[in-house]
Structure formats: structure tokens, C-alpha cells
Amino acid sequence: YEIPLRLVGSEMCIRDRLTGDLGQPISAYSHGMKQKLAIIAAWIHDPKLIIMDEPFVGLDPKAAHLLKGMMRELCDVGGAIFFSTHVLEVAEKLCDKVAIIKGGRLIRSGTMEEVKGDDSLEDVFLELEDASC
């Protein structure tokens, strides 16, 4: 499969020079390139809600920085993003609300301030992990 050039409009695609690889089969793409392609596909139709699983895995620092900006921009104009991550610093910087799930069960949720208080999200997570062992 190839990506039709008419669908290439994303700033991320242009900045990360993915356009030079658009004639290649997607199966030949690296994990990071596939991740960028999935992000472009999610954003290309200007959604109000995006759900992502570990969106930063496989991204280079430049692409990760751009994605964070895209996420913040979508939320700033009234959109919403649900995403899972094990990188708690990213969640702490990006999220207005957070939920911590363990073993498929919700163990804490609320605004970032409600969940973490004066602690870091990582400290709260580790405390909850220790308490449930």
C-alpha cells in the first residue's frame, strides 16, 4: 500500500521529511515512521476526539515535541485526547485529567491536581503500586 500524495497535508509529515518515503510500501517503514503515519491519519480529518495508545513510542525527539504541540493545540480549541502512556512526566505536563489503571481496574482518577497534589505523578503512581502489592 502507498499513501496518496493528495492526503499529505500534515505539518508533521512535512517537517519530519516523511514525504520522501511516500512511494515506499508501508511495510518497509520503520516503527517510528509507521507511528508518524498513524498520527497523520488520526489528525488529517480535523477530529474533535483522538484516542491513542502509547503515541510517543518510536518517535524521535523532534516528532515527539511536535506531537505534544499538536495535542495541546487540539485541546486548546475544545478537542479531547485520551492516551495511554508509561512516561508519567509527559502525562503530567500534557494532561488536565488523569486516570491510573492497574490490572484493568481504575485505582485513581481526577484532575491532575486532585490526583497528585503536591507530589509528582510518578511518586503517586509508585505509592499506589506499593499499596496494591
Which residues does each PLM region occupy?
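A short, surface-exposed alpha-helical micro-motif characterized by mixed small hydrophobic
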Residues: 91-93
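Single conserved hydrophobic/aromatic residue that forms the stacking wall/gate
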Residues: 1-9, 14
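Catalytic Walker B motif of ABC-type/P-loop ATPase nucleotide-binding domains
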Residues: 50-54
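Conserved ABC nucleotide-binding domain
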Residues: 11, 15-28
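ABC ATPase "signature
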Residues: 109-110
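Helical segment within the ABC ATPase nucleotide-binding domain
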Residues: 65-77
